[in-house]
């Protein structure tokens, strides 16, 4: 049913998709408007260039899915598997990712504005060459977000909260950091070579 709708209409509008097996689905360039997706397998699916607006994904697998160049606005993802997702060059605005896993996820060259990552594991996630504006990373369960070995090299971060984040062995080499909050963050082994930091808050005694 969902596949037929996708083929006939090139996307979904106002639909609820639940308990569907859609792994490896080809949905490049598709349009998703006010869609609710629950307990659905979209792993390794191709959603490159898709336009996703005012939609919610819950308990859904997007492992190794391709979201390259996709556009998201007012999208919320709850308890989703985003491990190894390819979200390079993604454009996301007013989005929230909660209770999910996005380890080894790729956001290279992405533009994220007013985005929240809550209780989401981002170990080894890549944000290199990306633009992050008013992005919040938080995890009340762990005391701070999990971003060990994350890659922010060459990225531009503006008004970003990484308060109490675990950023051990993360790299910010060549990054531009404006108004970034690193208060109480764990920065052991983090690489700030060539980074420019303006108006940032770092842990006491730390100098990038």
Label each region the model flagged.
Residues 7-208:
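Tandem repeat scaffolds
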